[in-house]
Amino acid sequence: MKKIVIIAVALVLATGLVFAGGKADAGKAKIGVSMPTQSLQRWNQDGANMKAQLEAAGYAVDLQYAGDNDIPTQVAQIENMIVGGCKVLVIAAIDGSALTEVLKDAKANDIPVIAYDRLIMNSDAVSYYASFDNFKVGVIQGEYLRDKLNLKSAAGPFNMELITGDPGDNNAGFFFNGALSILKPYIDSGKIKILSGQKTFAQCATPSWSTEEAQKRFENIVTSVGYGPKGVKLDAVMASNDSTAQGVTNALVGAGYTKANFPLLTGQDCDKASVKNMLLGLQSMSIFKDTRTLAAQVVEMVTAIAKGSTVPVNDKKTYDNGTGIIPSFLCEPVFATLDNYKELLIDSGYYTEADIAVK
C-alpha cells in the first residue's frame, strides 16, 4: 500500500500540474503556445497577451511563432514542445488540416490540446477550442452593409464585391457564410450585383490572408469590371478581415478612390493600420476581437485542465473537426466604427492615441 501511494505521488509530481491557491507549485507547469506568424499584427498581440496572462497565473510559457506561416516550422516547434515537457498545448494552426500527425504524439503523451481561434481539423487529440463566435463575425459584417445600404427598402441595385480568407483556416468559411446569411437573399434577388461574378468561397479566398494577394486580386477585379471614381460605381466590399481589407484599400487608392468616393468596406481585428484607415475614411468598420479576453479565457481553461476541474465551455454543438464535436468557448465579437472606436480601443487600454495617430 505504501509503495502504491509513493508511486501515485511521484506520477502527480511528474506532471508538473500540482496547484496551491490556483497557481502552479511544482516547478511551474510549462504551457506550449504555438502561433502561426509574426507578419500580422493580431498574432503578435495574441501571443504577447497569452504569454503575459499565463505567466501571471504562475505558468512557464514556451511561445513560438512559425516564421511567416510556415507549416513545417510549426510542426517542428510543436514536436519540440511535446519533447520539451509542455503539459498543455495552445495552438493557432496555420493550416487546420496539417497537424494531424504531430498531434498523435501529443495524445500519446496525454498532453491536452486547445485549438486557439482556428479549429484544428481531423485530429482526435484536440480537447477544446477557444475562439470568438466566427459565424457571428460574418453576420455583423453582413448586417452592417445591409443597414448602411438600406437594402431592406432601397431600390438598388448596388454593386458589391466579396473577399475572404485562407482556405486552410476553418474560420474563413464561418466568416464568409455568416456574411452571406445576411447578404445572399439580396444577391439572389438582384438588389446586390457581384459584377466580377466571383461569389463562391473558393473564388473569394485569399491565401494566408495576405494583404498582397488581396491587393492583386482586387486590382484585377477593378480592371476587369471597370470600377473607378469615373467608371463603374462600386458601392461596397465585404472583406472578412483587416489584412484583406488593407489589400482592397491599396487597390482602390491606386485606382483613384479617395475618402470622398470610397465604397463601404468591412474588416476584422482592428489592426492599427485599419483603424488608421477608418480615421482616414478608407475603411468603414472592423470587428473588435479583444485578444486579452480570449487569452484570459484560455488561462481559465488551462487552469481547469490542470486542476482536473470542469473546463468552461459554452458551445457543444457547432464545431466538428472531423473526429467529433469539440467543446468550445466562444467570446463575443463587437464592431468598431468612428462612433465607438475610442471607447473600445483607447479607453479600454487596448491602444494608445499614439498607436493609431494619423500623420
Go through each PLM region and give its residues.
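Positively charged n-region of N-terminal signal peptides that target proteins for export
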Residues: 1-10
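A residue-level marker of the well-folded mature domains of exported/periplasmic proteins
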Residues: 3, 21-359
